[in-house]
Amino acid sequence: MADHSSSSSSLQKKPINTIEHKDTLGNDRDHKEALNSDNDNTSGLKINGVPIEDAREEVLLPGYLSKQYYKLYGLCFITYLCATMQGYDGALMGSIYTEDAYLKYYHLDINSSSGTGLVFSIFNVGQICGAFFVPLMDWKGRKPAILIGCLGVVIGAIISSLTTTKSALIGGRWFVAFFATIANAAAPTYCAEVAPAHLRGKVAGLYNTLWSVGSIVAAFSTYGTNKNFPNSSKAFKIPLYLQMMFPGLVCIFGWLIPESPRWLVGVGREEEAREFIIKYHLNGDRTHPLLDMEMAEIIESFHGTDLSNPLEMLDVRSLFRTRSDRYRAMLVILMAWFGQFSGNNVCSYYLPTMLRNVGMKSVSLNVLMNGVYSIVTWISSICGAFFIDKIGRREGFLGSISGAALALTGLSICTARYEKTKKKSASNGALVFIYLFGGIFSFAFTPMQSMYSTEVSTNLTRSKAQLLNFVVSGVAQFVNQFATPKAMKNIKYWFYVFYVFFDIFEFIVIYFFFVETKGRSLEELEVVFEAPNPRKASVDQAFLAQVRATLVQRNDVRVANAQNLKEQEPLKSDADHVEKLSEAESV
């Protein structure tokens, strides 16, 4: 049996800077050799008396249904409400743009890119503009960014509701989009940063499932007002007013949430971060073996950089500084584009037009079908959020996008068949494939769309990665929504065929480049991205075990050195006291 005490004591004598991040893990050529070398020295090490091989095992932490996490879930639920804003807007505009009262009120043409298309796409312009202010959440914190964003959406919703002209409506929608982007960037970042590694898939994944809740409320409120106030401005004005409901709730209850522990460490408030972890991760246990380890990992990840430093906060060059940074940025860009350009935006915003193209022309029926579509996607996304930590991110993406391509193939065939024959069976088949597409796509992409970009980013670049994410997704949505009315009118079902081939392209890219993040701490992922091939490293279990052992050893050294410093302080004071007594006696 190894002599644990001798191993620990030998490490305690080493200064903390003997294990350097770059020297140990930064050289691609010697990457695995360095990890193997570090791993050889980890035998017998403990953290607070717990062997390192057990330090990250979930046996030390309860499951997601444990009562100790209820407080954490309460915090996250408040931020989840931010996800409803884009879902509400998508279903709202997708429901009201076919209403005659709405089209006449604002003098719009349903197939006009400069009319209906512009009203839709201005939201994406506002999103792109708002994205450039996302890094400000590094300045004052995630919580203020969430609150300011939601307050801005409330004001924008009031403007949109009171307007009587198309220009004012467009302005109000830009205002909503601008501030919704700030809140929608800060909220998933907050969820990813406050969640323990073994729960992050569920905690952060559930965030975007409330996109469908906003969509459901918008669709059915529009359906209700359309039934009760036909041919009246109330049919679309009331849903426009209701757009402020969810962000208003965040403004009221958002003051109750504490700040993200990772942001607190990034601005030097380490004790507050430690208290957060003790309270929300470890059920108040100040002696838990993972406390010092988690804190040490977070502290090291910032490399002494002040997160709120204006020069650092606005410097987007950090997204592309190193090879691993560029790989991360590539994944953020791909995820942002794929999340909006897989055919899902067409279904979200233009479902009524899709239904009209297969013979379903009743406005109230189309609005109702829009609501049912939202329910289908919501249920599927919740299932995905709970399974994503079991099947993994890569398998989830690959399964969803391949299923989506098959569903769009079926939709293309049924739509083409209906155009030729006008048969009811073809129309019903198209409806089935629309819902199949929504359910399959939402299973993986909805819970992971906002989560994945935060997972693959570092603590230092997460806000800037969100900037990149929202700019790219905004451009993708703008292209989609501005071009879709014309495309659906002119090329009809061939528009769906285009997305079939694009989804196949996505499958290939995801298979060869996307990194698996399941179960890794955000700090462990930093090591994965430094590997010569991050995608291969992320699924190499032997490599990941070495990474974990290396990080645990590093943390053990830090803890030991910190304890030594604390022990030396009283000894020093005692020595001074004895020296003073000796001087007094000699006098």
Swiss-Prot record:
Residues 94-116, 165-167, 224-237, 352-370, 416-424, 492-493 are extracellular. Its main location: membrane. Keywords: Glycoprotein, Membrane, Sugar transport, Symport, Transmembrane, Transmembrane helix, Transport. The keyword Transmembrane applies. SUPFAM superfamilies: MFS general substrate transporter. Residues 19-35 have a biased composition (Basic and acidic residues). Residues 1-42, 568-587 are annotated as: Disordered. It is found in: Membrane. This is Lactose permease. It comes from Kluyveromyces lactis (strain ATCC 8585 / CBS 2359 / DSM 70799 / NBRC 1267 / NRRL Y-1140 / WM37). The gene is LAC12.
